[in-house]
Structures are given as C-alpha cells and as structure tokens.
Amino acid sequence: MILMKSPEMNTRIFLDGGDPAETEEIKRLLGFLDGQTTNPTLIAKNPEARRRLGQGLKYTEQEVLDFYRGVVRTVSGMIPDGSVSVEVYADATTTAESMLKQGREMFSWIPNAHIKFPTSTEGLRAAEQAVKEGMRVNLTLCFSEVQAAAVYAATRGAAKGQVFVSPFVGRLDDRGENGMDVIANIIALFRQADGHVEVLTASVRNLDHLLYAIRLGSDIITAPYGILKEWAGQGMPLPSPEYRYPVGALQPVPRREISLERPWREYDIGHPLTDRGMEKFSADWKALIATEDRKIA
C-alpha cells in the first residue's frame, strides 16, 4: 500500500536521526518526509561511527566534522525541499562567538540547513546574530514557555521559516511533568504573535506524543525512526475529534501570563534540563574524538 500525507494535516513531519538509511526507509514508508533533525548523540549512533568506535578507533576533530558534514549532505540530497537541522557543539563554557563560528561553517554545508543552538544565554546570543546574518536557526533543548518567549524576542524580525523552537517532551515526562502541556502552552503563547517562530515538537517518545502534537497544531514534529515506522504501519492515522491524550500520573504544567514584548535578556531562561542536555550532547561529541585532538570550546 502506498501512503500519502493527508491533505487535512498541516503539521510537517521530520525524522530525528543521524543515519541516512533511516531517512530513505522513512521516506519510503510514509511516502514523504518534510525534514530531519540531527544532534551529536544521533551522529554518535550512526552505524559507521559505532563500527569505528567498536574497533577502538576515534576521530580527530576535523574528521568528525567531515563525517557530520557527509551525513547531512547525504540527508539533504534525499530531502532537498525539506529542512535539515545541524547542531553546533556547546557545553557550559562555550561562548556565543564559538557557536556562531561553528554555525556559519555548518550553514555552508547544505542549502537547506537550520543551525541548532541551545536555548541558553550564549545560545540565544548566537542565534540573535545568526538571524541578522540571514541564517536559519533551531533553538533546541527548550523546556518552558518562558524559554520559548525568549526565543521569540531574540529573533524578532526574522522571516517565517527562519526560526524553529524545539520543546522537548519526553525529558519533561521523565521528571513526572506533562511535557505535552508545554507544547500546548507555547502554541497558545504564539497564537497572537507574528508567526516568525515555528514550534517543532521534539523528544517524542511514543505515538501519543505524535498524535497529540498533531491535534494541538504543532508546526513541526520530529520523531525517531521507530515511532514513524509504527505510525506508518497503522496507516498514518490522525487524531479523531474524540482523541484524548493519556496523561496518566504526569503533573500538569499550567500556562503563564508572559509578554512577548520584552527584551530577551529580561526573561529567566535557566532550566536544569537545558544544562543537562548540553552536558549530554557535548559528552557524546567528545566521545567520538581522540583526547589529544579536542579543541572545540
């Protein structure tokens, strides 16, 4: 059976992965693919990288960048009309200037890149300048409505399609909080705004995350291979009007009264999960590189 994207669905579907073989398979299963998101952890899980590490071999810093570039160029060629998110290296000490330097280089790799910066103070500084230079950006590791407001303020004046914000659902669920409430809250926050920031639902762990994000009207959803394969296997169902998201024991995350008119530096954007996510991504990146060759900071 050949599947096609329902004309009733406005949400774009991205694959969250670092293996072009998965890209090819998901395109075949769905009959379409609107884009792809990558990050250091996903690149470290690429079969070629895992084989190399399994042999006790590591990369030089330039080799790992060349490998990452090769992966995203292959993916870009498969979805030339879609977006491919490419993530800079960022740990707790990485400056905006370093992120921006990396971002400029990565943006030149492919014609359809969105550069991922963390939703941290330095990440927002980098994104603010990147947008002014005409780059497309994706603010990742977002866990709160306040952080999303800061993304909006830092990128004010950008064109629609130039800025994504990626709230992470599953990692909030892991803390016992209803991560889908954060998606709903951010979508509601932006409803009366100018539309220059698009909501990209990320850290999707199950089919209900996917279905509820579609129901909420998320601009984009990125999901791993297994979940998109499961969705395709069921015929790519859309949530019915009677659909109810199974909250279970997750605690609600109430909406807040937040103005989008303030300078971005006035928002309290600190979040422990953002810090933890940066630590995890940077550790996975460093694990690919021989100790004596680590230079990124």
Language model features: what each stretch is:
Residues 50-57, 61-65, 154-157, 181-189, ...:
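Ligand-binding grooves and catalytic loops that recognize ribose/phosphate and carbohydrate rings
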